[in-house]
């Protein structure tokens, strides 16, 4: 067993990604052929569940793009279900401290290293027990990315980085800017300073920094600073703005809804 996304992060190769919120295996497969290194299937803010995640994993599987899945919460039961349908890389939201980071790691490991329930005879991940010695190989193939999105998490970042099994730390600029009192403005100098400092801390600890930023200039800036997994757009935004722009070119009134630049 291997995890190409985890291997790329370990090798220090920057990975460029796209956020998936349409909950569609059809659009997921379309985007899997677009050339992104990874695709984030969002279960926190998009209406995904285990069956819709599964169909998107199946759609992406023939392509080089690697799937990353964000559950709605740091919940071992939900994580267990996602791992059983074949998720290897998780982005766990709203991790505030080392204890919560350890819980996320333990949820992805079989005992005695963790608390993942054993049900490989029912699991796509083990090819229904057709993968030899799956239970003893699975732990090493897991990639755990934890998401820091508050001032509290930033304060606890050194301890989070000390947690064995955390492969990367993802900075959530939308929630972080809101928590810092600059909601809707992740480009505020105070927020940017916090993000840049966090990227440096994560790199110095030997972990992979990640972020979502649809602002191309800022996304490239984060890559220059050492971010290793950067999502540079969102499928819903690409579809909505592209459709609006096309309609506007043929006379439709264009409404400026504004954007934080994150999504």
UniProtKB/Swiss-Prot annotation:
Substrate binds at residues 147, 174-175. GO terms for biological process: 4-hydroxyphenylacetate catabolic process; phenylacetate catabolic process. Binds 1 divalent metal cation per subunit. Pathway: Aromatic compound metabolism; 4-hydroxyphenylacetate degradation; pyruvate and succinate semialdehyde from 4-hydroxyphenylacetate: step 7/7. A divalent metal cation binds at residues 149, 175. GO terms for molecular function: 4-hydroxy-2-ketopimelate aldolase activity; metal ion binding. Its EC number is 4.1.2.52. The keyword Signal does not apply. The keyword Metal-binding applies. Keywords: Aromatic hydrocarbons catabolism, Lyase, Metal-binding. The active site is at residue 45. Transmembrane segments: none annotated. The record marks 70 as: Transition state stabilizer. InterPro entries: Aldolase/citrate-lyase_domain, HKHD_aldolase_ent, HpaI, HpcH-HpaI_aldolase, Pyrv/PenolPyrv_kinase-like_dom, Pyrv_kinase-like_dom_sf. One of its GO terms (cellular component) is cytoplasm. Its cofactor is a divalent metal cation. SUPFAM superfamilies: Phosphoenolpyruvate/pyruvate domain (SSF51621). The record marks 84 as: Increases basicity of active site His. HAMAP family: HKHD_aldolase. Catalyzes the reversible retro-aldol cleavage of 4-hydroxy-2-ketoheptane-1,7-dioate (HKHD) to pyruvate and succinic semialdehyde. Belongs to the HpcH/HpaI aldolase family. Homohexamer; trimer of dimers. This is 4-hydroxy-2-oxo-heptane-1,7-dioate aldolase. It comes from Klebsiella pneumoniae (strain 342). The gene is hpcH.
């Amino acid at each position: 067993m291997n995890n190409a996304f985890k291997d790329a992060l370990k090798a220090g190769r920057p990975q460029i990604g796209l956020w998936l919120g349409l909950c569609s295996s059809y659009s997921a497969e379309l985007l899997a052929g677009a050339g992104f290194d990874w695709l984030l299937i969002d279960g926190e803010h998009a209406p995904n569940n285990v069956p819709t995640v599964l169909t998107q994993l199946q759609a992406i599987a023939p392509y080089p793009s690697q799937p990353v899945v964000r559950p709605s919460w740091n919940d071992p039961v939900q994580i267990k279900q996602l791992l059983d349908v074949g998720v290897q890389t998780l982005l766990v939201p709203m991790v505030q401290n080392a204890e919560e980071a350890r819980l996320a790691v333990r949820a992805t490991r079989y005992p005695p290293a963790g608390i993942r329930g054993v049900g490989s005879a029912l699991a796509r991940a083990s090819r229904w027990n057709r993968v030899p010695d799956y239970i003893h190989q699975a732990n090493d193939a897991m990639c755990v990315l934890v998401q820091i999105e508050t001032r509290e998490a930033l304060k606890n970042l050194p301890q989070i980085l000390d947690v064995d099994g955390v492969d990367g730390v993802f900075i959530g600029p939308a929630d972080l800017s809101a928590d810092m009192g600059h909601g809707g403005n992740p480009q505020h100098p105070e927020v940017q300073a916090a993000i840049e400092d966090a990227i440096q801390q994560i790199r110095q600890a030997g972990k992979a920094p990640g972020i979502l930023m649809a602002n191309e200039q800022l996304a490239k800036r984060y890559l220059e600073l050492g971010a290793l997994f950067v999502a540079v757009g969102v499928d819903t935004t690409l579809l909505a703005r592209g459709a609006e722009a096309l309609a506007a070119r043929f006379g439709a009134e264009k409404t400026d809804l504004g954007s934080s630049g994150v999504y």
